[in-house]
């Protein structure tokens, strides 16, 4: 029977953990969608997590962020209110809440929470911008980690595009064994396209095989998912003929190539190219049915706009369409890219940003309609040119290019990793028997004591909370039956793809049997030593505790009397009470070695002032007619 019961307990426990893992998988998927700017899809999953009552505070906050990004302040405010009044809230939430309230016209409320954000150490510049209606919502924390690529050359490098194990990129480095013309703009060789094979860990670039590279500029490029088709930019140089407009300018054009027998060949001119303006920077939609590009063709909004054109099944093209004023400005919009979720990214010097060209993402509502663009912030953007954004299909890594190092005329390629939210989780257990501890209280703070969250373990001893990376933390655990414990840990240098940090905690039981067994005091009737029914109930708690939870614990029995009667009589009576207690424990399952002593102390250890000669009521005397238990050993 016991084995069967234990099996059921284990089954329920494992099932509960499996359910939690499944919910965490959902949360991770939602977080990836969020960092990929797929806010509608992410919102749907966060709503599911809320319905499942999984990590609700976090899910409400993220759902509110999604709605704010989607410019739905009513729904954003609704979900911010689910977390805003809690004791420990990330400071960024106050700012986002202030932004949402301002969108609704609640200027008084917006100012209140903006001041609260500033008071908690928030950026005063953001508060000032909010008051001037110049704020644009941005993700709360940096969502990318950046490092310089190991295949940069001393020349200009940009336009990285990964397909399979190959990274294609554009560079003004010289091609081995090829005599190249020099571009008078910067006195470097004309741009060509190169590849790096990530599978071989070889950082030496190789020129793209085939007919792509010419005497003039090539790149950047985009490749279809099946790897058979490339669209790339090149100077207007086709069939070895260089064409200029009437002003003598040789513009950029987009060409199509096929991959055959390990070579890029069959170069084709596209029908919407024009000798009088540039068409460049191609980007394909995930399904390969739409081509995006940049052009300075007449009729646009600025110096260079972004356009799209449909690609038909027969290989023909539809009408070229301008992407409109939400994306295009009076400045330059360049280097479009569409990620696996269908979200458009691009570079612009016309939208508010950090410097010259900045990288922006686009936001769509639940109907798929473009509603806004948002700056990707630092570290993607700097005070210099930042462009040619590329994101891998998994949404967790990619490349950009930048001249942020102030190398005149030179651009470098940077690799980025998406920083997914980190989930702190663990199980609090008994250090003696390994059993999970339910209702343990956990206080999570930063190293400097800044409060983050108050947590409570569930029936399986499990806890979780989302935390920031690159931080040091304190985690204080407490429970009435256990000694307090402070655990120090950190989230430094954790790989970007790792989304969980496990901190398990073992608590040492207190050496107090009354506390451990939830024991009520065992009392005796006046001048009696028999075990009363209420006392028997308490003794069975002790038997259960020592049998099922602490099989190596040993205890001592200590019995007492009130002060009525002679001291010698009471000494004898207390011994009888100790003996009856001991015999009850042994006769009901405890072995003799578990109770190492059972002693009587007569009236020598009264719990109150009811000694000889002091008038006390019966309830007061009752408090002294008792048996206590002392833990001698716990292993």
Please tell me what each predicted stretch does:
Residues 3-9, 19-635:
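N-terminal targeting segments with Sec-dependent signals, encompassing both cleavable signal peptides
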């Amino acid at each position: 029977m016991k084995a069967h019961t234990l099996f059921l307990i284990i089954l329920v426990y494992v099932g509960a953990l499996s359910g939690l893992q499944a919910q965490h998988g959902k949360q991770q998927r939602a977080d990836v969608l969020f960092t990929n700017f797929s806010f509608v899809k992410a919102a749907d999953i966060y709503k599911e997590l809320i319905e499942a009552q999984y990590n609700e505070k976090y899910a409400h906050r993220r759902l509110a962020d999604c709605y704010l990004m989607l410019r739905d302040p009513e729904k954003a405010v609704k979900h911010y209110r689910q977390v805003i009044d809690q004791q420990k809230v990330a400071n960024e939430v106050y700012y986002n809440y202030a932004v949402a309230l301002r969108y609704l016209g609640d200027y008084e409320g917006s100012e209140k929470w903006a001041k609260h954000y500033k008071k908690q150490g928030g950026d005063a510049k953001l508060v000032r911008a909010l008051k001037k209606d110049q704020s644009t919502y941005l993700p709360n924390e940096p969502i990318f980690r950046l490092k310089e690529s190991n295949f940069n050359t001393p020349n200009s490098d940009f336009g990285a595009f990964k397909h399979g194990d190959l990274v294609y990129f554009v560079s003004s480095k010289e091609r081995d064994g090829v005599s190249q013309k020099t571009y008078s703009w910067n006195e470097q060789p004309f741009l060509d396209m190169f590849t790096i094979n990530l599978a071989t860990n070889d950082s030496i670039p190789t020129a793209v095989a085939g007919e792509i590279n010419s005497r003039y500029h090539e790149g950047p490029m985009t490749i279809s998912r099946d790897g058979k088709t490339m669209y790339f930019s090149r100077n207007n140089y086709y069939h070895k003929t260089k064409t200029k407009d009437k002003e003598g300018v040789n513009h950029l054009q987009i060409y199509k190539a096929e991959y055959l027998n390990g070579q890029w060949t069959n170069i084709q001119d596209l029908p919407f190219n024009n000798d009088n303006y540039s068409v460049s920077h191609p980007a394909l939609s995930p399904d390969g049915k739409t081509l995006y590009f940049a052009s300075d063709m007449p009729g646009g909004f600025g110096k260079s706009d972004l356009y799209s054109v449909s690609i038909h099944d027969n290989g023909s093209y539809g009408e070229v369409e301008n992407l409109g004023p939400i994306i295009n400005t009076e400045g330059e919009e360049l280097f479009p890219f569409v990620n696996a979720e269908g979200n458009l990214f691009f570079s612009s010097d016309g939208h508010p940003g950090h410097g010259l060209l900045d990288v922006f993402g686009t936001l769509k509502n639940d109907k798929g309609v473009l509603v806004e663009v948002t700056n990707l912030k630092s570290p993607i953007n700097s005070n210099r040119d930042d462009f040619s954004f590329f994101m891998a299909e998994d949404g967790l890594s990619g490349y950009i290019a930048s001249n942020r190092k102030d190398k005149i005329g030179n651009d470098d390629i940077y690799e980025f990793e998406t920083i997914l939210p980190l989930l702190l989780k663990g199980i609090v257990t008994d250090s003696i028997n390994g059993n999970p501890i339910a209702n343990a209280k956990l206080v999570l703070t930063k190293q400097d004591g800044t409060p983050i969250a108050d947590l409570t373990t569930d029936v399986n001893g499990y806890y979780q909370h989302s935390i920031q990376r690159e931080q040091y933390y304190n985690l204080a655990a407490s429970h009435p039956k256990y000694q307090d414990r402070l655990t120090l840990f950190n989230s430094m240098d954790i790989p970007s793809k790792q989304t969980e940090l496990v901190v398990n905690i073992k608590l040492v039981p207190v050496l107090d049997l009354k506390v451990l067994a939830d024991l009520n005091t065992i009392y005796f009737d006046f001048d009696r030593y028999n075990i009363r029914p209420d006392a028997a109930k308490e003794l069975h708690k002790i038997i259960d505790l020592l049998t099922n939870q602490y099989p190596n614990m040993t205890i001592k029995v200590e019995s007492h009397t009130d002060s009525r009667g002679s001291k010698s009589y009471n000494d004898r009576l207390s011994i009888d009470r100790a003996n009856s207690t001991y015999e009850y424990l042994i006769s009901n399952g405890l072995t003799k070695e578990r109770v190492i002593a059972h002693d009587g102390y007569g009236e020598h250890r009264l719990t109150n002032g009811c000694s000889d000669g002091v008038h006390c009521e019966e309830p007061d005397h009752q408090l002294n007619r008792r048996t206590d238990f002392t833990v001698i050993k716990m292993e």
